[in-house]
Amino acid sequence: MVLVYKYFSCENEIENSIKPVINLMESSLLDKTTSNSIVLTTFNDFSNWARLSSLWPLLYGTSCCFIESASLIGSRSDSDRYGLVPRSSPRQADLVITAGTVTMKMAPSLVRLYEQMPEPKYVIAMGACTITGGMFSTDSYSTVRGVDKPIPVDVYLPGCPPKPEAIIDAIVKLRKRVAQETYESKIRLKPGNRFFTSIHQFRFVSNNLTGEYSKQSLRQFTKTELYSTLEVPFDETTDEYKGSAVSFQESMDEGDPVAIDKP
């Protein structure tokens, strides 16, 4: 209520001049409709919205790309503003950023870490070596030609190595994908229903390392051949070396190599 004093001589006029003024704050509350005060959504959308700012990445680096991904923790990139909290345990991580070359011996460990992560989980393939094998993809027998062979990949991030700004852009694209997920898509992407892009066409061969390599006939040299290979002067008549700088001491066993004693 607001008092407006027009005439101070008459009390009746003062009382009649009292006029009610509508409170604007109360009117806004009264004018609000149900659609503006209550948000109607589904549990799936609410779950996606809650997970957008809580993607916890797993620290997994095997090569130089990990140096760029580790720089996200610094103040220059400030990955905390996106809710990225690096974790060392796969059971507390939602995202794994594979940074570096994946070898044949390291692939089973990567699959084991991926299986220990709770659903839903995501993978970002960072760097050329992770996506296609990089410079090791042509003549290397121990490099996996793409991390999407053992585990599924959600976002591919090419580069050698990618900059921290590119990693943030990949995370933003992953957030958009998480926001559009549905329950049917989560069921379809379960481990039992996943289909990988391609498989390796490697074949197993027999092991030729039997330990008999040093005992083959091609590896047996006579003294003359051995000394000529070493380019040391040798007198075949006296069966001795020329010069006093180096003296050779024959071994007791014939199969043992010649011992060299330097003064």
Curated annotation (Swiss-Prot):
The keyword Membrane applies. GO terms for molecular function: 4 iron, 4 sulfur cluster binding; iron ion binding; NADH dehydrogenase (ubiquinone) activity; quinone binding. Its EC number is 7.1.1.-. Pfam families: Oxidored_q6. Binds 1 [4Fe-4S] cluster. GO terms for cellular component: chloroplast thylakoid membrane; respiratory chain complex I. InterPro entries: NADH_UbQ_OxRdtase-like_20kDa, NADH_UQ_OxRdtase_20Kd_su. The keyword ATP-binding does not apply. It is an enzyme of class 7 (translocase). Keywords: 4Fe-4S, Chloroplast, Iron, Iron-sulfur, Membrane, Metal-binding, NAD, NADP, Plastid, Plastoquinone, Quinone, Thylakoid, Translocase, Transport. Belongs to the complex I 20 kDa subunit family. NDH is composed of at least 16 different subunits, 5 of which are encoded in the nucleus. NDH shuttles electrons from NAD(P)H:plastoquinone, via FMN and iron-sulfur (Fe-S) centers, to quinones in the photosynthetic chain and possibly in a chloroplast respiratory chain. The immediate electron acceptor for the enzyme in this species is believed to be plastoquinone. Couples the redox reaction to proton translocation, and thus conserves the redox energy in a proton gradient. This is NAD(P)H-quinone oxidoreductase subunit K, chloroplastic. It comes from Huperzia lucidula.
